[in-house]
Structures are given as C-alpha cells and as structure tokens.
Amino acid sequence: MSQQVIIFDTTLRDGEQALQASLSVKEKLQIALALERMGVDVMEVGFPVSSPGDFESVQTIARQVKNSRVCALARCVEKDIDVAAESLKVAEAFRIHTFIATSPMHIATKLRSTLDEVIERAIYMVKRARNYTDDVEFSCEDAGRTPIADLARVVEAAINAGATTINIPDTVGYTMPFEFAGIISGLYERVPNIDKAIISVHTHDDLGLAVGNSLAAVHAGARQVEGAMNGIGERAGNCSLEEVIMAIKVRKDILNVHTAINHQEIWRTSQLVSQICNMPIPANKAIVGSGAFAHSSGIHQDGVLKNRENYEIMTPESIGLNQIQLNLTSRSGRAAVKHRMDEMGYKESEYNLDNLYDAFLKLADKKGQVFDYDLEALAFIGKQQEEPEHFRLDYFSVQSGSNDIATAAVKLACGEEVKAEVANGNGPVDAVYQAINRITDYNVELVKYSLTAKGHGKDALGQVDIVANYNGRRFHGVGLATDIVESSAKAMVHVLNNIWRAAEVEKELQRKAQHNENNKETV
C-alpha cells in the first residue's frame, strides 16, 4: 500500500538565507498562503530568536495559516526554544525544530565539545521543546559526515526524549545517493525505537545531487522530505521541492509513495516565489522552467503532435500551467475580475479587490486585453506597494536622446509634503534615481537591477526588481508598469518605503526597550 511522504517546505527559512535582501512580513505571508494553497504539510517560516523581524513574520504566519503545520527553527539553546514557542503559540498546533551538529568535525571545531555532551544537550532541549508542543523535530546537523554508529546513538536518544520527527541533513551536499540511502537504511537497522518517529531528510545541492539524494532516501524509508520552492537556498541551494513532488508522482511505480500536494498549484507557487524573491527561474529548470515543456527538435515536435507521451512524461496542465485565457477587457466589471481570481484559486483575503480592479482598468485601457498573468502581477507584485507608504511617486517626466544628456523631473510625496527635483543621469532611469536621491537625501547605493517582462508582446507589463544598500543593510524593491522608467521609479520608491518602515520598527523597538527599562527602575 502506498505511504504518504510529508512535504516540509523551508522556502521562508533556509531558502530566504540566499536572498540579497530580506523579505517583508507581508511578502513572507503571501508566500506562506501560496504554500498552504499548494498543500505543503509543514512550513518552516523562520528562526525567531535571530531578529524581531523574523519573530514577527513567524507569529503573523502562525496566526493566519490554518491548513499547514507552521514550524520555527531553534538551536539546542534554551532561549531559542522558548522564543520559538512564544512566536508560534498563536497557532492551534505547531512544530518546533531544534538541531545540533553531530559530525566529528563540527563537534570538535565548531562546538568544541564531545559526542556525549552533544547527546546530553539534545535530550534536554528536545524535552524542553516537548513542554510547549507534542510535535518536535530534531536534526543532526552534518549527518552526512557523521559515522553511522554515532548518528544512531544520537537518533535513539532524541526519540527517547520525545522527538516525533528525526531529520537527517546532508548539510554540505557531500553524499552520493547510494551513500545517503545507506545512511537511512543503516538507521532503520541500528535504532531500536525508530518506529516511534518519522525519518526526514534535508539535502543541499552543492554537487547537484539534492533531489537525487532525497529520492534515494525516500526509497530507503524516509517519509518526510525538506526543501524549498525552485531549490533556493544557501550556496548552491536546497532540494527543489517541485522536482521531488513531481518525481514521486511520475515514478510512483518504483517509489510506491504519494504526497498530499495539490499539483495544480505548483507552477503558480513557483512563479510567485521567483517574483517576490527576485530570483529568476532558469529556462531549462526542471518542472517549472519556461523550456520544461518546449520541443524544438523537428523529430520531437512531430512525435509530440502524434502523441504527447512520446516525449512528455508529464503535462504542463499537471502542474497548473494551463492555456492563457483572453477573457478580460476594459469593459469587464469588478465581478468578472473577482470571478477570474476565484477560478485561479485565490481567496479575496489574499488581495485587495478594490485596488486590483482600479489597476486592472488602467492596464486594460492601455492593453485592451488583460491576461491571467497580468492579473496575478497586479494582485501580488503590485500588492507589495500597497503597504503603508511614507513616500509616493506623484509625477515624473524624462527627456533623453542618442546625443542628449538624460534629464528627469520628479515629484515625490514625502509624508504630507510634496517635493520636486530635476537631475541629469546616465540614461533616463539613472536620471530619475538621481532626482529621487536629491529629494530624500537617502543616497542609496544600487546593487542590483533586473527587468522582466510579465506577459507577451510589446504591451507586456515590465517588472523591475532592484536591491539597494543603505547604512549597511540591503533592501529590495519592485515596480510594475507598462513603462520601464515608471517601473524603475516605483521600484526605488518601494525601496525607500522599506527603509522608512525599517527605521520606524527600530524606533518602536527602542521605545519598548526604554519603557521596559523604566518599569524595572520603578519596581
């Protein structure tokens, strides 16, 4: 009988570590809701003790996500576990994931400890986590380079202490699939109480083997796979969840397992993660790349036309990549837009219908027809600019030519005041940025600029993603418009608002800290 493999998503924790700029709470919530809609069993959404921002994101997601188990990471440190529990307690049920290194190298050089001390610490911390929840995951960091006898000792002790999931990470992407399968098999042979926990795997792609290692582990008995959408993560990335999920579906004949994933949401979730994280998907990426279902060879094209199964082991429709519909125009009403969003699986609570419809009408007047991908871009990329604003683009105008110096005039609303500046630059975008810098006096340093067409043809929406440095921190901004210069200006204004919000959060934290200090003095 087919057994279920639990899908544990760590896009918002391990995946986010690879990003050039941190995501906002609202951006993380958007991704979390998409993952919930896709049907992931568990989502690891942050490391609460690491920062107030991470704590807030975990708490916000734990409060709103209902159909997936929300999890937070904690080292084998008392404060980590206590803070993780505090951030998660708003959820009806939650998981705490705690970890400690087990390989001889890590124990000796990083922890400066012994295996016996590591086991003792693991037991204590698992028991501490169990005081808060009956769902505790324990990870043996660098398990791939841990002798099997040592690993078995740690695993047995953690299960006895109350761990309900034991995670075996290939932390540095070192093992071969046959080796990794051997580790899982070895644990089943050596750990007497292994039937009391679910065995999980967490692989990295340093040698390009993350998916292969995860599937080999599943074949050997692992029943949870951890990974990130699009394989994002530190260094070469994490195990690509969409690849593992579809491999399990397509090769059920060999693996004899299944997942609870809604496969129709894979493509949409992948695209959303790519857009929000500002990480384009390579065209040749398995499952979700733009070329994944493209056939350019004449022989292949002929074979596909005769029977798609000649060269396709799965269909675009199986991951939710359906034919684009041309059913919305400037004459479409608000109800029609809502109906189309409903058909695509989006809840009204995930977007602002009034704002979406206003943006839709403006775009429809310019383009004539509005596609599904246009609606998604307006609803979710545009949504990032709907957060409370201190800065707002009021007006811009540029003059440039092949032999002229680019000049930009910009009006920016700064709180209640509207300010204007004119500046020259190396091209129209640079001129606009110079004018904005003069208005705000922030003097941000542009680190990355990318432009992506959202749609097809000359009237496609242009999405500009930028990363900028300010006071030693990196901030991400996104802008969306049919005009590239306007998209660029909106992206910079988004960065400025993110900087302003970060400063406001810092002020609030300082205010609370001072308030607590005053209360202590009073007592």
From Swiss-Prot:
Q: Name the pathway.
A: Amino-acid biosynthesis; L-leucine biosynthesis; L-leucine from 3-methyl-2-oxobutanoate: step 1/4
Q: Where is this region: Regulatory domain?
A: 392-523
Task: Kindly list the positions annotated as binding Mn(2+).
Answer: D14, H202, H204, N238
Key words of the record: Amino-acid biosynthesis, Branched-chain amino acid biosynthesis, Cytoplasm, Leucine biosynthesis, Manganese, Metal-binding, Transferase
Question: Which terms in the GO cellular component ontology are assigned?
Answer: cytosol
Reaction(s) catalysed (UniProt annotation)? 3-methyl-2-oxobutanoate + acetyl-CoA + H2O = (2S)-2-isopropylmalate + CoA + H(+)
Domain of life, source organism: Bacteria
Subunit details for this protein? Homodimer.
Family listed:
Belongs to the alpha-IPM synthase/homocitrate synthase family. LeuA type 1 subfamily.
The protein here is known as: 2-isopropylmalate synthase
Q: Which organism is this protein's natural source? A: Escherichia coli O127:H6 (strain E2348/69 / EPEC)
Q: Which gene encodes it?
A: leuA
